[in-house]
Structure formats: structure tokens, C-alpha cells
UniProtKB/Swiss-Prot annotation:
This is Gamma-glutamyl phosphate reductase. The gene is proA. GO terms for biological process: L-proline biosynthetic process. Gene3D superfamilies: Aldehyde Dehydrogenase, Chain A, domain 1, Aldehyde Dehydrogenase, Chain A, domain 2. Pathway: Amino-acid biosynthesis; L-proline biosynthesis; L-glutamate 5-semialdehyde from L-glutamate: step 2/2. It comes from Koribacter versatilis (strain Ellin345). One of its GO terms (cellular component) is cytoplasm.
């Protein structure tokens, strides 16, 4: 099938998927989970072929890699989505007008949801599960490095007994034109979600005529305030930077209050270096960390999402300078303040203009499952149509049901 034919098939499937009962959707998800468990070796073989052909290493290879444990996690994720409440048909509000009209606002599927993503085959199953549970047809355009893994997974999903014909479409990853056609498919596709690096997201935002929900890019900050518990700060900074550095909710920048910088900067820089982190710093950081392996930060560093074991450190005068720096340089993803000062914390929570703001906790919690939403399509860093974890409820829109008894205006 051509790209156009696949998009048209998804459009035809959308109303069929939207009409599926909760029981039918859950049965599909559970059946797919069982099949994934049963066909683990087939999926691993496809993934091994991708790994051999890709030539990737480091964090990029890790994103592409599937293991028996990761495949089991994919299947378990489908079971978790099946256990979640169905958002479709949920009553958001209802009221009666003085003229007797009864109005009800209800959740409905978006229709056809497309996702453009890089070499992460686990995303394929996550998105299929979320799309089905929220009553949407789905169009997938993964990275060329994961082409065999994605083809295997979509083939398995599409063959699930009871799956509406055309509900899951995989576009040709070797054909760059497929992305161009997808981005211009207004009327066939209701929304595109680009999930990946800043370059991919910006390309889709600038070129798509289909509505776009931005996700992913995470230049996340931690600010250690003057009243911070420094042992707590150590734990949070190391977790946020090193636990999984290649993901979007990993911290990339550390801001330290000047009042504690003399004590804390050398301490945290040593700890970061001991954990294998490349450290870059502003002039004050360099002066305070003399004798340590710290590179001078450039102006570009403050805007860069490293996605690796690298962190830039800056000394700031106070919470207001920290907020100003964050609002100028962040990607509006996740920011955290470590402080014992309630007033400073509440100012930070109110004024830091990002999707998730934390007080005394790691930025690594910005995740659908960690927030209790189940799996998610990504983290939305824009303000419309949703912000933060892009989970089941965010894969719906709303409509108004108006019931009368012959009223005219």
C-alpha cells in the first residue's frame, strides 16, 4: 500500500475503533499481550537484525535494543492499559438550562493519531495500546534503524483476532516522502505527535499542516536553594542525571544558590565526576572547582539537551535568578527546586513555566506511569491541547450532547 492508501485505511477504521466497547478493547489488549509473550523469540530475532544493521552504540543502541525483559515489560504495559478506566464516553460535565435543554459534555476519541518517533521499538506497542484503549486508529512512522522490529510488532498486533481492519498502520521508514505526506494529510489524520530529539520535533512543527502536539525534548533543571538539605540534594541530582541519562526527564543543568556555592559546588562536582558525568561550568563554578576536571560552559550549553552523562553547573544569586534562567533556557519539560524554604518553593512552583515542577524530588518522575496515568505517548511541552504526560485522557477530545423536548430559539 502507498502512504496515502494507508492513511485512508486508518481514516476508514477510525469510526469502527471508536465504537468498540470497553470489553472489546480490553480483550484486544490482553490478547495482544499474550501473543507478544508467546512470540518473544521472533521479536528478538527481528531486533537483532536491526541492531546488526544499525551500527549504533552507546545510548542510541540502548534505545533500539529489545531484551526478553523489555518485551515482557511491553506485554505487561498492555495489561496495565487494559486495567485502566476507559476515558471514552466519560461525562465531564452536565447541566440543565432554564429552557429545559439538558447538556452533557463527554469524552470522545480524537480519530486518527499519528506518531513520528525514533529508534525505540517499545514505543510501538505502547502507542498501539494507548490508541486502542482511547478508541483511536493509529499511524506509526518509526526510525529506519528499528524497521524490522516495528514491522514484526505491527504484524503481530494487526493479526490480533477482532482487530478492526486498518486500525494500525506502519509507514515506510526508508521513504522520507512518507513523513512529508503524513504531515500534509490534514483531513485524514487528526493529530501528529513527534517523539524524539529537538530537531525532529522542530521539523514536524514547522512543516506540518496537521495539528501537532510537541513532546519530548527535555532540557531539565535542578536548583539547589540556600536552605536545601545537601544530602537530599546529592541524592536527587545524582538520580536525575545518572539513573537513565538518555531520557527526556533526566536533568541536564544544575543551578546552585550563591550562598552555599562555596560548600556545595566542589562537593556535587566531585560526586558527579565520581559517577562518570562530564561536568561543564560557568566562571564561578570553575573557580570553586579548581583542580577538578570541569570544562568551561559555552552559551550553547545552557540550551542543549545532552541525553548523556553530561551536566552543566551554574551559580545563581537567588530563586528569582534561577527561575529567570530556567524560563529562558528550558524546553518547558521538568524543573525541580531543592529547598526547606516554603516561600521559595511555592514561588518556584508558581513561576517556573514548565509542564512539571518539583519540590524536593527528582525530575525523573515526569512519566505517565509514575503519575498514575499508565503508559503515555510522551511528555507534552506545549500548552494546547495538553501539557505533561500525554496519556489516555489526552488522546480524547470532547463533544456536547444536547437533549431537548422540542425547544427552538
Amino acid at each position: 500500500m502507498t502512504t496515502r492508501e494507508k492513511l485512508e485505511a486508518a481514516r476508514r477504521a477510525a469510526p469502527v475503533v471508536a465504537e468498540l466497547s470497553t470489553e472489546s478493547k480490553n480483550a484486544l489488549l490482553l490478547a495482544l499481550a499474550r501473543t507478544i509473550d508467546e512470540r518473544t523469540e521472533e521479536i528478538l530475532a527481528a531486533n537483532r537484525a536491526d541492531l546488526e544493521a544499525s551500527g549504533l552504540d552507546g545510548s542510541l543502541r540502548d534505545r533500539l535494543l529489545l531484551t526478553p525483559e523489555r518485551i515482557a515489560t511491553m506485554a505487561e504495559g498492555l495489561r496495565e492499559v487494559a486495567a485502566l478506566a476507559d476515558p471514552v464516553g466519560e461525562t465531564l460535565a452536565e447541566w440543565e438550562r432554564p429552557n429545559g435543554l439538558r447538556i452533557r459534555k463527554v469524552r470522545v476519541p480524537l480519530g486518527v493519531v499519528a506518531i513520528i518517533y525514533e529508534a525505540r521499538p517499545n514505543v510501538t506497542i505502547d502507542v498501539i495500546g494507548l490508541a486502542l484503549k482511547s478508541g483511536n486508529a493509529v499511524v506509526l512512522r518509526g526510525g529506519k534503524e528499528a524497521v524490522r522490529s516495528n514491522e514484526c510488532l505491527v504484524k503481530i498486533a494487526g493479526a490480533t483476532p477482532g482487530m478492526p481492519d486498518g486500525a494500525i498502520q506502519l509507514l515506510d521508514a526508508s521513504n522520507r516522502e512518507s513523513v512529508q505526506q503524513l504531515m500534509k494529510a490534514r483531513g485524514l489524520v487528526d493529530v501528529i505527535v513527534p517523539r524524539g530529539g529537538a530537531g525532529l520535533i522542530q521539523f514536524v512543527v514547522e512543516n506540518s499542516t496537521v495539528p501537532v502536539i510537541e513532546t519530548g525534548a527535555g532540557n531539565c533543571h535542578i536548583f539547589v536553594d540556600e536552605s536545601a538539605n545537601l544530602d537530599m540534594a546529592d541524592r536527587i541530582v545524582i538520580n536525575a542525571k545518572t539513573q537513565r541519562p538518555s531520557v527526556c526527564n533526566a536533568a541536564e543543568k544544575l543551578l546552585v544558590h550563591r550562598a552555599i556555592a562555596k560548600e556545595y559546588v566542589p562537593r556535587i562536582v566531585k560526586l558527579l565526576l565520581d559517577h562518570g558525568v562530564e561536568v561543564r561550568g560557568d566562571a564561578e563554578t570553575l573557580a570553586l572547582a579548581q583542580g577538578m576536571q570541569v570544562a568551561e560552559a559555552t552559551s550553547a550549553d545552557w540550551d542543549e539537551e545532552y541525553l548523556r552523562l553530561c551536566m552543566a553547573v551554574k551559580v545563581v544569586a537567588d530563586v528569582d535568578e534561577a527561575i529567570a534562567h530556567i524560563n529562558q533556557h528550558s524546553t518547558k519539560h521538568s524543573e525541580s527546586i531543592i529547598t526547606a524554604n516554603d516561600a521559595h518553593a511555592r514561588r518556584f512552583l508558581r513561576a517556573a513555566d514548565s509542564a512539571a515542577v518539583y519540590w524536593n524530588a527528582s525530575t525523573r518522575f515526569t512519566d505517565g506511569a509514575e503519575f498514575g496515568f499508565g503508559a503515555e505517548m510522551g511528555i507534552s511541552t506545549q500548552k494546547l491541547h495538553c501539557r505533561g504526560p500525554f496519556a489516555l485522557a489526552e488522546l480524547t477530545s470532547s463533544k456536547y450532547e444536547v437533549i431537548g423536548s422540542g425547544q427552538v430559539r
